[in-house]
């Protein structure tokens, strides 16, 4: 597929899944280096008898949370949970996370400390290590990106494509 056609398709107003489908088509011909291609909540890299499972999600202020309606601790905890739940749903045990924060001046200091307390609470509860990330300033909204990493036996991966009604995760 030609790049211009893909760019046009990606700029049209679409559902999340049709947009992801366009991205998968655009990048599908590139090498995956052992990772499973786009199409599930996580990607999987099989390493012998073990699988490394990775997921990422973004949370944007006024889209995924309202600063006035949720405490900073709640937002921190939720940010981790939405990611490690994807890893767990694939049959893996969450083990590590990367956290990137873009904070306006109004969220630096007390709000950021509360956020980190909530994020820490989730990490401590589920035995997840924070192993890296990034911080930057933003103009007026909070943007949060979390990468969750988990491990599982290669033969225990639960894929959305194989899910059946009544399955228990």
Model-predicted regions and their roles:
Residues 49, 59, 94-169:
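Glycine-rich anion-binding loops of enzyme active sites
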Residues 39, 70-74, 78, 110, ...:
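Residues at secondary-structure transition points
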Residues 39-40, 83, 94, 141:
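Short Gly/Ser/Thr- and Asp/Glu-enriched loop/turn motifs at secondary-structure junctions
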Residues 44, 83, 91, 130, ...:
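Residue-level signal for inorganic ion chemistry
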Residues 72-96, 117-125:
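Small-aliphatic-rich amphipathic alpha-helix that forms the alpha element of a beta-alpha
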Residues 8-71, 90, 99, 122, ...:
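Extreme N-terminal cap/leader segments of soluble proteins
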